[in-house]
Amino acid sequence: LNPFRWVINKYREWKNKKDS
């Protein structure tokens, strides 16, 4: 598992919720 990919995934999820 790539931690960097995981961080990007979490960031995108968070950004999505913030934009909603």
From Swiss-Prot:
GO annotations of cellular component type: extracellular region
Gene Ontology molecular-function annotations: toxin activity
Keywords from the named record: Amidation, Secreted, Toxin
4Fe-4S among keywords: no
Domain of life (superkingdom): Eukaryota
Keyword Secreted: yes
Residues the record lists as Serine amide modifications: S20
Expression (tissue specificity): Expressed by the venom gland.
Location in or out of the cell: Secreted
Entry similarity comment: Belongs to the cationic peptide 04 (cupiennin) family. 09 subfamily.
Protein name, UniProt field: Short cationic peptide-6a
